[in-house]
C-alpha cells in the first residue's frame, strides 16, 4: 500500500529473509465499539512497534498530519486519501493525552 513497506510514522523499512514486512493499521479500529470502516482511507502502513503504540493511544495524528506523542509528520503519498474523520476519531477516542 505505501512506499514498499516503509512505516508512515518512523520511515523504517523492515527487511526479513522472506522479504519486507510492515503492518496495516486501522486508524479508527474496526469492530465494536469503534466500528471503523475496513477501507484504504482508514489504514496506515506501520512498523510493528509503531502499530502497537498507535493502537494503544500513545501516538496520534493532528489534522495537518503532524504527529502527537512523537516528533514528526506522517509520511503520505498524494494518492493515499486518508479519512480526516478517522484521524479525528482516533485522536478524540483512542489517544491518551
Regions found by a protein language model. Name each.
Residues 1-2, 12-97:
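A detector for short metal-coordination/catalytic motifs
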Residues 9:
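Acidic/histidine-rich
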